[in-house]
Amino acid sequence: MSNGRILHTMLRVGDLDKSIKFYTEVMGMQLLRTNENKEYEYTLAFVGYGDESQGAVIELTYNWGKTEYDLGTAFGHIAIGVDDIYATCDAIKAAGGNVTREAGPVKGGTTHIAFVKDPDGYMIELIQNKQASAGLEG
C-alpha cells in the first residue's frame, strides 16, 4: 500500500455552522463541499487549504440533533504547518479563536509549535512550516 495517501480526517461536530465558520474564518480554510443525507439525518462539510486532489482535508460530520460529543482520551490532535506561527496565533486570537498554548519552542527542542482548540474541543497543533516536514526535532 505504498501508493496510498491520507484523504481526510473526520470530526463529529455539534454545530455545523459554528464549525464551518471556525475552520474558514479563524483557521483560513475553504469550504470545499457539503453533502446532506436526509434519510440518515446527517450533513457532511469538507474544509481544507486546497483542492482535495492535492492534499488531506477535514470532514466535519453533523448528526442532526446531536449537539455534543465525549471526545475521550484516544484522539490527540490535528497538525497544520504554518509559515509564521507567531503571526498565525495573533490572527487566530483576533478572529476569536482559542489559542491554548502560545507559540514557542517545544519543551527540550527547537521546533516552534502552538495549540488551538476548535468549537467542539478538538486540538489543533500549529508547527512552523520550515520545521513541519522534519517533525518535532530537538
From Swiss-Prot:
Q: Tell me what organism the protein belongs to.
A: Vibrio parahaemolyticus serotype O3:K6 (strain RIMD 2210633)
Q: Cofactor stoichiometry and binding? A: Binds 1 nickel ion per subunit.
The entry marks the following residues as binding substrate, namely: R12, N63, H77
Say which family it is in.
Belongs to the glyoxalase I family.
Report the top EC class in one word.
Answer: lyase
Q: What is the gene called? A: gloA
- Could you tell me which NCBIfam families the record lists for this protein? glyox_I
Its recorded name reads Probable lactoylglutathione lyase
Q: Under the cellular component aspect of Gene Ontology, which terms does the record hold?
A: cytoplasm
InterPro entries in the cross-refs: Glyas_Bleomycin-R_OHBP_Dase (IPR029068), Glyas_Fos-R_dOase_dom (IPR004360), Glyoxalase_1 (IPR004361), Glyoxalase_1_CS (IPR018146), VOC (IPR037523)
Q: Which Pfam families match?
A: Glyoxalase
Note the coiled coil stretches, chain numbering.
Answer: none
Could you tell me what this protein does? Catalyzes the conversion of hemimercaptal, formed from methylglyoxal and glutathione, to S-lactoylglutathione.
**E.C. number:** 4.4.1.5
Annotated S-S bridges: none
Required cofactor(s) = Ni(2+)
Q: Per the UniProt entry, what are the Gene Ontology biological process annotations, in alphabetical order?
A: methylglyoxal catabolic process to D-lactate via S-lactoyl-glutathione
Spell out the SUPFAM superfamilies in the cross-references.
Answer: Glyoxalase/Bleomycin resistance protein/Dihydroxybiphenyl dioxygenase
Segments forming domain VOC: 5-129
Question: What PROSITE patterns does its record include?
Answer: GLYOXALASE_I_1, GLYOXALASE_I_2, VOC
